[in-house]
Amino acid sequence: MAQATATTEKLNKFEKLKLEKDGLAVRDQIQHFASIGWEAMDPGDREHRLKWLGIFWRPVTPGRFMARLRIPSGILQSQQLNALANFLQRYGDQASIDITTRQNLQLRGLLLEDTPEFLERLHAVGLTSVQSGMDNVRNITGSPVAGLDAAELFDTRSLIQALQDDLTAAGQGNSEFTNLPRKFNIAIEGGRDNSIHAEINDLAFTPAYQDGTLGFNVWVGGFFSSTRVAPAIPLNAWVPADHSVIRLSRAILEVFRDNGSRGNRQKTRLMWLIDEWGIERFRQVVSEAYGAPLAAAAPELMDWEKRDFLGVHPQKQAGLNFVGLHVPVGRLTTEDLYELARLADTYGQGEVRLTVEQNVILTHIPDAQLPTLLAEPLLTRFSPQPAPLSRGTVSCTGSQYCNFALIETKQRAIAIAQSLEAELDLPRPVRIHWTGCPNSCGQPQVADIGLMGAKVRKDGQMVEGVDIFLGGKVGYDAHLGEKAMTGVACEDLPDVLRQLLIERFGAQARSH
């Protein structure tokens, strides 16, 4: 594990934990942990260091762990889905799978004694979960239609895979980047519609031409936390669309690793270092670490409204299509994994892609196969054309599995969306994002309507409620929403949302 530059600030408890023992050290102890059981483990190993392997202790479900994978660009193969389902089916109803807002999968129900086998099975099908938690670079996101979209400017798939391989030592764990001051999100966009939500990443690359050469402008510092929300800002830098992206990513990570605050945990994301130094000094130090002067930013090319990729769309490959399917709040079962793999093999070329909206895309579907695919039973649940509120509903895990969540989110999100759709006609889809706590995993600030879990007082009792954000925009001219209402009890939420949809989004009551 790389050591941070010496500092006089008081280290937070997580930094002390990392100094006591390298997070990656638990790789060599996983068989031992499996044999002694979770109750006998050192709490620091069980509750924190296992996260370096992508294994998460869940206090809400004692003894049942969560695994978070790494899926660059959200691209999976059918054999990988089948392998995951084959492993998880032993847990029956205790197993569930969530698509995340970083094109990733989180698998729930894992028993500690099964983790050695689980990690071996991941490796056997080319998957890894290493460095997917704690102070590491998280899943690297990209356009979910990279290589398929006729309008794309650059196919980012191989670049994103190469960057992940570099930062994780091809999935084995890279100690150069396992001791960051805090987690770090990277995204690379190759299209015109900001499918990656560049503004909410610590580091984002967006397409731009410099003197006729296609490359990327660079954005830094975007993040959500319980105490602050900050959109990414321009670094005023451009790099060509080649290994320079990896070099610059490494340089920025090294600067962050060696200079970022390790004191107050609420002030350790990259933007706090940029605030302390100013963007010009930060750019200069990054340039020195990069080993060359940084070219100034070029004109931006992201000028489209964001697409959600649901429905049938022709690919750049003649006669082939991709089909986006809506997965309600991203929740899957083991049977769903089997079915998605079967559909990908039967109708396409065995590929399934995940989106940041928690949906899936089946690719390479021939024109002649579309009618049969669209008649498949799974598509009655995972619709290519969902109703306008369900279509844009995103939700974090909520209190069912997360100890940070203040409210239940997923089932409530589905129920309220369906109820309002039965009562209202909407002229366009409205994106509603739910997050169970201020950590904002559900990204409420990018939604038309964002709902953040809170405990509120009603009739003298503390009940589940939300704060409401309005005005988030994605795609061209993206910006974050602002908190507009606080302390709304969840039982009052349907009426409040109904009024918002009528007053702000042109909804009209249906006549019955």
UniProtKB/Swiss-Prot annotation:
GO terms for molecular function: 4 iron, 4 sulfur cluster binding; ferredoxin-nitrite reductase activity; heme binding; metal ion binding. Its EC number is 1.7.7.1. [4Fe-4S] cluster binds at C396, C402, C437, C441. It is an enzyme of class 1 (oxidoreductase). The lineage of its organism: Bacteria, Bacillati, Cyanobacteriota, Cyanophyceae, Synechococcales. The gene is nirA. SUPFAM superfamilies: Nitrite and sulphite reductase 4Fe-4S domain-like, Nitrite/Sulfite reductase N-terminal domain-like. It comes from the Bacteria. PROSITE patterns: NIR_SIR. It catalyses: 6 oxidized [2Fe-2S]-[ferredoxin] + NH4(+) + 2 H2O = nitrite + 6 reduced [2Fe-2S]-[ferredoxin] + 8 H(+). Siroheme binds at C441. Belongs to the nitrite and sulfite reductase 4Fe-4S domain family. Keywords: 4Fe-4S, Electron transport, Heme, Iron, Iron-sulfur, Metal-binding, Nitrate assimilation, Oxidoreductase, Transport. GO terms for biological process: nitrate assimilation. This is Ferredoxin--nitrite reductase. Coiled coil: none annotated.
